[in-house]
Swiss-Prot record:
Organism: Buchnera aphidicola subsp. Schizaphis graminum (strain Sg)
Sites where the protein binds ATP: K270
Protein name, entry field: Cysteine--tRNA ligase
Database matches in PANTHER family: CYSTEINE--TRNA LIGASE, CYTOPLASMIC, CYSTEINYL-TRNA SYNTHETASE
Enzyme Commission code(s) on record: 6.1.1.16
């Protein structure tokens, strides 16, 4: 029985979709004004894992993740780079997809770009004005009135006064309330990036985009709405308020939020100048290591981004690959099934990946024990380990590929190593221990790690 922590109620609840086994799932996507950073990676690895698991246990998931391809930062960046805005956003989206693909993040079922839904956004704004939830100010901007929604502030579970004091909200004399927000921003005369509307040329505000897109794809309900915890207020609060005012029958059953990335005891933020581009991190660490790192912490908790923690993840993942090294995974319906039961129990408890990881490492210890006494039996458990880890999106490569990747390959050195191992094995069988030790020392100098099993000796380069 799957339980999910619901931000709206601040508790774990048994998950039941609104309609049978079909799930409407929406995650706020990237504003493509620059390369993706590790905060993006954390959020989308988490929701990739969640979607994979929901499908694994039998749900039909309709997964939508938007792309914001128009806003002030995008306009400024394209002008700075002296490149057409659509060409610029296409480049950024291509880079985003490349990074996400390396991390094993499967694409959503639909990835709507905001600029393709301007007409839908205008229709939504027109209805909000008609319902007296929005007004046009003297500048010609369309503004949402938070006072028109008596439930405003309930999602983030704070009083409006606290929400205002705890958030950077600009005070504008053109607003009836300082925390009212823009739905449609009227363009200045010199601005090129605008669309015609009943209120003159302009472009949409950020919050209205998700409301309009979810209205197109989901109409009356979303089973799971996700995003980073930094979006809870004001973005998600504003979004759900707009959606309620647009459609009184609209509901989100579960709100899910992933934790922040912490760097040197501060949340990662471009405004603080402490963010890391994902592409730069991927030059130093393999994508599988980074995915492992993100899932090693519970999705709701903050994750501490340090070189030490990345190295720990690299070593942990290497341990699992070393465990599989030398095995030939074979399915058995009985062996290791208890590990699988425990693994599913962990993920059914609000996607508890740290607990699921602990099951994988228990399984690895079992395999390493069996490799020394019954290699053929270890193959059954190796199959189970590979299968369960695969559900989370790792251990998808061969051990040989992972362990030797990025290491120099020289055919002559390989031949020399295998010759030394053969001589050492002969010396051991002949009980020529001193000779065997000398040969082992030569192999160590060649950066070789040996693993002696009853039937054979495995070797690999030290990474």
């Amino acid at each position: 029985m799957l339980k999910i922590f619901n931000t709206a109620t601040s508790k774990k609840e048994i998950f039941k979709p609104i309609k049978n086994k079909k799930i409407n799932l929406y995650v706020c996507g990237v504003t493509v004004y620059d390369f993706c950073h590790i905060g993006h990676a954390r959020t989308f690895v988490v929701f990739d894992m969640i979607v994979r698991y929901l499908r694994l246990i039998g749900f039909q998931v309709k997964y939508i993740r938007n792309i914001t391809d128009i806003d002030d930062k995008i306009i400024l960046k394209s002008l700075k780079e002296k490149i057409d805005i659509s060409a610029f956003t296409n480049i950024m989206i291509k880079e985003m997809n490349k990074d996400f693909s390396l991390l094993g993040i499967s694409p959503p079922d639909e990835e709507p770009r905001v600029t393709n839904y301007i007409i839908d956004i205008i229709k939504v704004i027109e209805k909000l004005i008609k319902n007296k939830n929005a007004y046009v100010n003297d500048h010609g901007d369309v503004i949402f009135s938070i006072n028109s929604d008596k439930f405003y502030g309930t999602l983030s579970r704070q009083s409006l006064d606290k929400l205002i004091s705890g958030t950077r909200i600009s005070i504008d004399k053109e607003k009836k309330n300082s925390s009212d927000f823009i739905l449609w921003k009227k363009s200045k005369k010199e601005e090129k990036f605008s669309w015609n509307s009943p209120w003159g040329k302009g472009r949409p505000g950020w919050h209205i985009e998700c409301t309009a897109i979810t209205n197109v794809f989901f109409k009356d309900y979303i089973d799971i709405h996700g995003g980073g915890s930094d979006l809870l207020f004001p973005h998600h609060e504003n979004e759900i308020s707009q959606s309620r005012c647009l459609n009184k029958n609209f509901r989100v059953k579960f709100w899910m939020h992933s934790g922040l990335v912490i760097i040197k005891n501060q949340k990662m933020s471009k405004s603080l100048g402490n963010s890391f581009f994902l592409k730069d991190v991927l030059e130093k660490y393999e994508a599988e290591v980074l995915r492992f790192f993100f899932l090693s912490t519970h999705y709701r908790h903050p994750i501490y981004y340090t070189e030490e923690n990345l190295k720990k993840s690299e070593m942990s993942l290497e341990y699992l690959y070393v465990t599989l090294y030398g095995t030939k995974p074979i399915f058995d319906p009985i062996e290791g099934v208890n590990f699988e039961i425990d693994f599913f129990e962990a993920l059914n408890d609000d996607f508890n990946t740290p607990q699921a990881f602990s099951i994988l490492f228990k399984l690895a210890r079992k395999i390493n024990y069996l490799k020394k006494i019954d290699l053929s039996k270890s193959n059954f458990f190796a199959f189970r380990l590979q299968k369960l880890a695969g559900y989370l999106g790792f251990l998808l490569n061969t051990s040989q590929y992972f362990l030797q990747k990025k290491l120099p390959f020289d055919e002559e050195i390989i031949k020399k190593i295998e010759s030394l191992i053969e001589k050492r094995n002969f010396a051991r069988k002949s009980k020529l221990w001193k000779e065997a030790d000398k040969l082992r020392d030569k192999l160590i100098k060649l950066n070789v790690i040996l693993e002696d099993l009853p039937e054979k000796t495995l070797w690999r380069f030290k990474r």
